[in-house]
Amino acid sequence: MKKWLCLVLFLTTLTYSITALLPSRIRVSAAEDDLQLHAKYAVLLDGDSGRVLYGKNEDTPAPMASTTKIMSCVIALEYGLKEMTCTTSAYAASMPDVQLNAKKGETFTLNDLLYSLMLKSHNDSAVIIAENVACYYIYQVQSGIYPDTYDVLSGKDLSFVSFPSGFDTSFLQNITTEQSKILVAVFTGLMNEKAVSLGCTQTHFITPNGLDASDETGEHATTAKELAVIMSYCIQNEEFLAITQTKEHQFGSYSVSNANAFLNMYDGVLSGKTGFTGNAGYCYVCACRYDGKTFIAALLACGWPPSKTYKWQDCRTLLNWGKEHFNHEEIIGKNFPLKSITVTDGLKKELPVSIHDTCRLLLRKEDLVNVVINTPDSIAAPVFIGDIVGSVCVYVNDALLFSTPVYADACIRRTDYLYFLNQVIKSFCFIDK
């Protein structure tokens, strides 16, 4: 029934719009605000709506160094178990600085490795995490717990991976470099699938630690905008936030302190990750919440040595600009008015409708906001409560930022043969009801 209803709506929909009453309707692009940033690629994103508030070459792919690790962390949290024991392979132990200096065969909990990954950006920890979480994913698939939904195992020789007595990764200390790389590819496959699901089609992960690399598909790279989108996803995970906000973590003989200096330099910082390689330059991504506003700033190629502080300057500039120019506006409230829809061939002639969501956006006074209501002129009975009969969309400067369904608020039966026969009988028998 709902499929036919959607077809009817598609054929008969009437679209009308409401232009939001704002102080000005002059369209101003963020590019017209020259913030004099050092970064070659930069973005300031509304962390709630995903709107680009400011951009500088924000859609141009570039290497992102250790900012990669925000995705590595969230994938490990989603696919691994924090208490699981992780074994260090020879390949993982061979990673260049910055290192935890884990030894081949050494074991850690995934939880401890995540602090090493995010607080000190250890490259060996990233590979240990990747290999062990990949093993756990393979174990889950082989056990039939869930399928290889994303097909990340397809075409890979996994004959060296077996779990005869339950999940145990101690065999990793004896595998070859090529076998390690297969496991890393499984993990980065999960990273890439997550990126695609977030709409990050220009992001390509090859390494879990962000070291520069290339393969047959392209370079290890993302865009400033997509890096910000990934961060906006990561901060929805409370465990991710807890790890990245920790000042210091100790485990065994190891101690790691948070290298994200911006946590103490700027009020409201929720999370952040630095990065540097010779190819990528200095990179940084952070999330900040101020007065109910969530800003995501991402910077790529933000100088090379000795310009290590450029990223802090640029990030402060972006966040200050966002705070100064943008405020929350309620576009769609709880009692947003919608016209009833005419019903044909129904026991009632009007269908009351409503939406279930509200919309608040970060706007600047120059923004042009249009609320577009897509509902049909009429609709044929029967209609049931909860049927989707249209949509309400919010556009800011012609960009779609919000969409929500319009729902039927009543059941209306069709006036069929039995209904008319009943009416005739009532008429002849002088029956009112």
Residue spans for each PLM region:
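Hydrophobic alpha-helical segments, especially transmembrane helices
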Residues: 3-4, 70, 290
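Structural motif marking the loop-to-transmembrane transition
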Residues: 1-2, 110, 417
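Sec-dependent N-terminal signal peptides of Gram-positive bacterial secreted proteins and lipoproteins
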Residues: 2-27
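Active-site-adjacent loops and short helices of periplasmic peptidoglycan-processing enzymes
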Residues: 20-225, 231-238
